[in-house]
Regions:
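Extended macromolecule-engaging scaffold surfaces
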Residues: 1-127
Length: 127
């Protein structure tokens, strides 16, 4: 059964973004302070070796953080519910994590960089 799941997940993966777990958790917590309370939507933009994490709330303002990342591929943008992502990230033990994406409409696969012991899948949000 596990082989079938991995085969399906591989179909979705086009780009791999490598991040330091603690740094991304800290950035997400700060950016989420400004996110809409109902959706907790956070936008991820990856380009030129940088990940830009941003959110906004009408009437309050916006937040933005940049983090260097290991990434090769075309520029990509996608949205995620920060609460779901934080739940996954705090459950992982590795120093680095991998966000694996195909585009902004397909599931995002999250796992430790050097391990496939735990694999999480989060559906993106349309922003």
């Amino acid at each position: 059964m596990q082989k079938r799941i991995k085969a399906i997940l591989v179909l979705f993966i086009m780009y791999k973004i490598i991040l330091k777990t603690k740094e991304i958790i800290e950035s997400l917590k700060r950016v989420t302070l400004v996110a809409e309370e109902e959706t907790r939507a956070v936008k991820f933009s990856v380009h030129d070796g940088l990940l830009v994490i941003s959110s906004q709330r009408i009437g309050t303002g916006d937040a933005r953080e940049e983090r260097p990342v290991e990434y090769r591929g075309e520029d990509i943008e996608f949205g995620l519910n920060s609460r779901y992502l934080l739940d996954v990230l705090t459950a992982l033990d590795g120093e680095e994590i991998s966000l694996e994406v195909h585009d902004n409409k397909t599931p995002v696969v999250i796992k430790e960089k050097d391990s496939e012991a735990t694999i999480a899948v989060i559906m993106p949000m349309i922003l």
